[in-house]
Amino acid sequence: MKKLKSYVLLVLAVLFLTACVTDQERPTNVKYIEKTDRTWQQHFTQLKQIQGYPALGQLGYISSKERFSTRFDWQYNNPRDYTLQLYSTISSETLQIQMHAQGMTISDNKGRQRSAADAKMLLREIIGMDFPLEQFAFWLKGQPEDNADYQVGENHLLATFSRTIDGKPWTADYLSYHVNRRPPMPENILLKTEGQTLKIRVDEWLF
C-alpha cells in the first residue's frame, strides 16, 4: 500500500508540471430564471434519461497543500460500475480509480493496486483528498440532485448548485456548455468546498 501511495504522489508530481489552473473565483452577477421553465424541465428530463456515458477532458485541483492538473477519461455505467482514469499527455504515467461490486480499486500502469470495500476511505488514504465520486456522475452532466439547492441560468441550463456532503458544503458553477450538441452538455465546471477547488473541462461527450 505504501508503495502505491508513494507512486500516486509521484504521478501527481508529474501532473503538477503541466498544471495551469485559472479562473478560480466563482462568477458573479449571474441572472437566473425559474426552475419551472419549460425548456429547463425538458432538458432536466433528458439528463435523467442518460444512465451511462463516457466523457473525456481535463481537471485541475488546488488546495492549500497541493495543486495539479491532469487529463481524465470517465466511463460511467451505474453507481457500482464506473472508472476514472487520470493521465498526463507528457508522460506514460496513469492512475485508475475503478468502482465495482466489491468496492473500489485504485491501480497504476505499473501493476500496483489497492482495493477496499470503503471507497471514501480508500480515496482519502491513497489520493489524500475527500471527493464524492458517487455524486460526480450527476455533477458532470449538469443534473442537480433532488436535495440540492440549484439555480437555472438564462440559457435554460443548470447555472449553479450547493450541496452538503458528510458535513462539507460543496458548490458548483457551470461556466459554459457544449451548446452545439443535443442535449447541451457542460463544458467548464468549477467545484468548490472548504479549502479545495476543482476545475473541470469536458472536451468530449462520447454518446
Curated annotation (Swiss-Prot):
Lipid modification (S-diacylglycerol cysteine) maps to: C20
Which keywords appear in this protein's UniProt record, sorted alphabetically? Cell outer membrane, Chaperone, Lipoprotein, Membrane, Palmitate, Protein transport, Signal, Transport
Residue numbers with lipid attached (N-palmitoyl cysteine): C20
Signal peptide positions are: 1-19
One GO cellular component term of this record is: cell outer membrane
Q: Which Pfam families match?
A: LolB
Where on the tree of life does the source sit, at the highest rank?
A: Bacteria
By its UniProt entry, which Gene3D superfamilies does this protein fall under? Lipoprotein localisation LolA/LolB/LppX
Family matches, as CDD domains: LolB
Among SUPFAM superfamilies, the record links this protein to: Prokaryotic lipoproteins and lipoprotein localization factors (SSF89392)
PROSITE patterns for the chain: PROKAR_LIPOPROTEIN
Question: Where located?
Answer: Cell outer membrane
- Membrane topology for this entry? Lipid-anchor
Write out the similarity annotation.
Belongs to the LolB family.
Sum up the protein's function in the record's words.
Answer: Plays a critical role in the incorporation of lipoproteins in the outer membrane after they are released by the LolA protein.
Question: How does this polypeptide assemble, per the annotation?
Answer: Monomer.
* Protein's name in the database: Outer-membrane lipoprotein LolB
Which source organism? Answer: Aggregatibacter actinomycetemcomitans (Actinobacillus actinomycetemcomitans)
